[in-house]
Amino acid sequence: MATRSLFHSLRCRLTNNGVLGSNFIRNAESSRFSKSYNADAAIGNSLVEESEEKDDLKSRIFRLRLPKRSATTVLEKWIGEGNQMTINELREISKELRRTRRYKHALEVTEWMVQHEESKISDADYASRIDLISKVFGIDAAERYFEGLDIDSKTAETYTSLLHAYAASKQTERAEALFKRIIESDSLTFGAITYNEMMTLYMSVGQVEKVPEVIEVLKQKKVSPDIFTYNLWLSSCAATFNIDELRKILEEMRHDASSNEGWVRYIDLTSIYINSSRVTNAESTLPVEAEKSISQREWITYDFLMILHTGLGNKVMIDQIWKSLRNTNQILSSRSYICVLSSYLMLGHLREAEEIIHQWKESKTTEFDASACLRILNAFRDVGLEGIASGFHLILVHNKCSLENEGSS
């Protein structure tokens, strides 16, 4: 189960950092997934340091530090001193607490909001509470809270939040039962994020064959897929070596009305990865390796996480994923080197790309493949990215990589 846990921990970074995991995804185009776990910790430390110089409400709450101390007590004292607070201020404090993993204090702030500002509580506020309850008290408590909401509060956002909680805890049967309720609902409208949660769950538990079923329902419901939807769909095809279907999906993406610069970058990089890695349909006959090791199929799903973040222009997450993969006890595949190398090149980070070349050459377990580098070079040229290809060519020359048969690789 170690490999699936690794995949789940990496995938959760896509979905765990917003109000439901869903608001974060909705806002990802602007935020570019700029907050990683280490960045969140740094934010928390800076807020604590800042709080020692200020005496506003947020500073008092962040000075609590220990989870056993009560944010409710701080709020009551603040009001008792004759101070005021707005619900938007409380939302912002709760958001900051979530970002720094202060879930208990964040939950206490939302509880105050419900008790004192119930008329102003939004669907997103209830969704946030479901997510926080699941983190603080467990999935059963989150489920009870959701079922106890009145009918008007059981919205697309709260349904999706509970589905996210099920997915995060790998509660497949519960998630499937809830998803059935969701797709049978006639009164609520769900977006791509809800379907993405279900596909993320299937990917994390190794049931990749169920991803196309979710896509089929999404299309029946006439829900527009987003780049995360496509990434999950493509990942499932690559993981099962269904490369013909993968190419069809890429073509569909090219003609999607939502296509933008990030999508084009994603499409180009996927094509480069498939061509330079030489992934073929024939590999679907390969046996899956023992559970204790990472199979080729699982490596490919990790690679597609990196491809997604490249499409979003988020170097921080590429760094984070690559570091996580290097820190495992598994032997890195040549495909993984090809993927991270292509990702850095696509975003114009030549210094990092050259560092990957050095790591690959110095690896004691994965032999450096100069011919793969030439395939990357030619693949960038094939999609019309001659400038990137030229920069990579210089890196190869500088590092004395063989360029024999360059035109035919």
Swiss-Prot record:
Keywords: Mitochondrion, Repeat, Transit peptide. GO terms for cellular component: mitochondrion. Residues 1-38 form a transit peptide. PROSITE patterns: PPR (PS51375). The keyword Cytoplasm does not apply. Its main location: mitochondrion. This is Pentatricopeptide repeat-containing protein At5g09450, mitochondrial. It comes from Arabidopsis thaliana. The lineage of its organism: Eukaryota, Viridiplantae, Streptophyta, Embryophyta, Tracheophyta.
